[in-house]
Each structure stands twice: as structure tokens, then as C-alpha cells.
Amino acid sequence: MTSYSIPKTQWAVQLTGPDELRLNTSKPIHRPGPYQILGQVEAVGLCFSDLKLLKQFSKHARKERIGSGIDPAILREIPSYVPDETPTVPGHETTVRIVAVGDKVKGVRVGARYLVETDYRWLPTTNSNASFGYNFEGGLQQYVLMDQRVITSPEGEVFLLPASEKLSASAVALVEPWACVEEAYAVHERTTLKDGGKMLVVADGSIDNKLFTAFLGRFGSPARITIVARESFSLDSIPVVRANSVDELPAAGFDDVIYFGSNPATAETLFGKIAANGLILFVQGGNR
């Protein structure tokens, strides 16, 4: 097994209070206990979340003391657990190389490279949850100590992601912010009709029952259809309720709205009838 020469002290940037940063050139490097993991920091990124911690310090929701989810006796064994007014080390976008592990650590290999996953959501604080770089010291230091009992979820997932040697350390550390960007902009809307939902059908002209039945068979069947149309319309398998006008229908009352037509005023009115996470479909039939 690969062995590393580990110094007794290190350089670290510590946050000691609101807007109070200190460069500590002799911060002790703690040797790992039985369940602990020591990583050498290869790269760390900083983001606006770190600025909020800088300004709020102990008032930040993730700097609070853990309230449940782990035995307090375990937390007392971890020198990198730094809640409340205890100085912390920021930096949650971190790439590490494991240089030492305790004899009871499983699944984490000395010499291996990892991206640190940040949020320990099974360990709640009063207003949020425990997190690497907040109430546990982060990566703005040369070495960081983690505890497997903290970073392992109730489902058994260890919050260290193996990182390829083909990527630069900074590229690995950027996974976390890019994942936030992707999550913020990813589309999660339904792409089919809501089975068992409420559907509104509005038609300026006629509807082909056969084609519409095939459409429902392919994309999902609502529990009930409300229809506003000049011509009669019925289905064998789904109750159809007729309404005289769109205006008399409740706001945000329908999971799926289908408009057979192209009248701008009608289309604008229909947007107000869509429920949260609902869909609207325009069938123009060649019109504009």
C-alpha cells in the first residue's frame, strides 16, 4: 500500500468570525482515528456560498450544531467538527488525495483521488444540515480530516466520488458548481399527459374523436375532461363535462390544457387555467 510522509503542521485559511480570515501557518494536522480519513487537498474552489459564510459565520444555517442523526460522542471525537463560534476552514469544492485512513475505514483507498461531496442532509441543524466547509472544516488548507461515520449516508453511500487521474484537480473541483448550474437549468417538466389528472379541451372547430382517442392511448389518460367547443364531443372511456366558456372555469384548475385553435386572446386566457406543473398543447391545424 502507498505510504505518504505527513507533516505535523500545515498552512490553512481559517474563518474566525464575521469578515475575519486568518492565515494559520502552523495548524496541526490530526492523524486519523479508527473511522477517519485524511486527505491532501489538490484543489479547492470558492463561490458565493463561501462569501455568505464569510459574512454570517456562526449565524449561517450550516455552521450550526448538529441536532440529530449521529451520536454526539462521535462528534466529540472529530477535531474537524467546528460548529457555532469555533473557527472553521471554508472551501466545499474540493479535490483530495487520500494519504491515511483509520483501521475501520471501508471503501476508501489510500492513494486514491476523490471529489468531496458537500451536503450531509441526514445530519440536520436547526435551519439546514451539516456540511463540509461549514460546520466541518473544508478544503482551504493543505490537509483535511473527515470521518466515515459522518460522510456515509443512511443508505450506505460514502460522500467521496472517485476522480479520474486524467482530469486536472481544478476540473474535478468544478464538478460541484457545474452540477448546481445543470440542476438550476435542467428541464423536469412532464412530457406526457397526467394519468388520472384533469384535462381541459378547447376547440374552435371540430375534433376527430378517433384521432383524439388514439392520442390519449399513446400519451396518457386523464380522469376527466372538461370541454369548451361548438360541436358535440364524447369518449367511451373517460367522462366528458361540457362548459359554456373558458371564462367560467376555475383558475389553475387543469393539469393538461389542449387548444384546437389559434386565437391569441383565447390562448392567453388558457394560460391562467393551467395548474402547477401543468402542460398546454396547441393544435393549430395549419392555422396561424
Regions found by a protein language model. Name each.
Residues E165-V246:
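Mid-domain Rossmann-like dinucleotide-binding core that forms the NAD(H)/NADP(H) cofactor-binding site
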Residues G261-R288:
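Glycine-rich phosphate-binding loop and adjacent beta-alpha segment
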Residues A43, E117, V202, I258-G261:
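Short, well-ordered coil/turn residues at beta-beta hairpins
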Residues Y35, G111, G196, A252, ...:
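Beta-strand-connecting loops/turns
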Residues R31, P87, G107, A171-L174, ...:
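Residue-level "contact hotspot" at macromolecular interaction interfaces
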Residues I74, I78-P83, T118-G197:
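NAD(P)H dinucleotide-binding glycine-rich loop of Rossmann-like/cofactor-binding domains
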Residues P28-V44, K59-Y120:
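Glycine-rich beta-strand-centered segment in the early N-terminal region that forms part
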Residues E248-V257:
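A short acidic, Gly/Pro-enriched loop at the edge of an enzyme's catalytic core
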